[in-house]
Each structure stands twice: as structure tokens, then as C-alpha cells.
Amino acid sequence: MATFKLVISNPKNGVAKQVEISGPEADKLIGRRIGEEIPASELGLNLSEIFGEEIPADAKLKITGGTDKDGFPMRPDVHGPRRVKILLSRGPGFRPRERGERRKKTVHGNTISPNIVQVNMKIVF
């Protein structure tokens, strides 16, 4: 059984809340990829209760990223639930210090697996 910390962002007001899920609800996330949308009710979440404002019951959550147990970020362009060392020039996992800089960095693939700890999501109305 997996346990995930979900960081759910509300793009309308810029507020983010952290929720922890485990058990069968968390198992529904395994195998999902960055960019996929999941109904909040499928994960057993009541968004109106979490955010303290009126959010439609049919709202979906879009996976935007996450990190694995060792802190390596997920990248949407690396396929599969694996960790890989790639040459980066920009994007998640690398912030260049000067123009044109490239560096090899370790990142996690775009698929959620049991070794993912944090999953970032945003509400899609």
C-alpha cells in the first residue's frame, strides 16, 4: 500500500493545500502520468472542505508533477516510472546559472510509482 502527500493548488486564488492519502485511494494514483486528470471524488477528497470555499463536486485534479523518496523531481518528458540521469538545459530539475548552460541531472519519469512521495496537482473546473 502506498502513501502520498498531495499538494493541491487552486489556480483561481493561488492557494495550495497539502493532504495525505493512503490505502486504496492512493493505489488509484499508481500508474497515472503527468497531465492526466482524475475526479477528486475518486480519491475520496472533498475539495470544498479542504479549501473552505465552494468548489463544484465534479471538479477534477490534474497531475502537474511530484518528487520521489530521495527528492528527485518528476519530468513530463521522461517516460516510465524510473529514475534516469539526463542532460538538461532548462525545465523541472535544473535551473541554469548562466545562458546556454547544460548539466547532467538525475530526474524521475512521468509515471507515478510506489517510490513517489509527493504528487503536485491543480484543480480543473
UniProtKB/Swiss-Prot annotation:
Annotated coiled-coil segments of the chain: none
Protein name: Small ribosomal subunit protein eS6
Pfam families listed in its UniProt record: Ribosomal_S6e (PF01092)
Lineage: Archaea, Methanobacteriati, Methanobacteriota, Thermococci, Thermococcales
NCBIfam families: PRK04290.1-2, PRK04290.1-3
GO BP annotations, alphabetical order: translation
Family classification: Belongs to the eukaryotic ribosomal protein eS6 family.
Entry keyword annotation includes Ribosomal protein: yes
Species for this entry: Thermococcus kodakarensis (strain ATCC BAA-918 / JCM 12380 / KOD1)
Record note on quaternary structure: Part of the 30S ribosomal subunit.
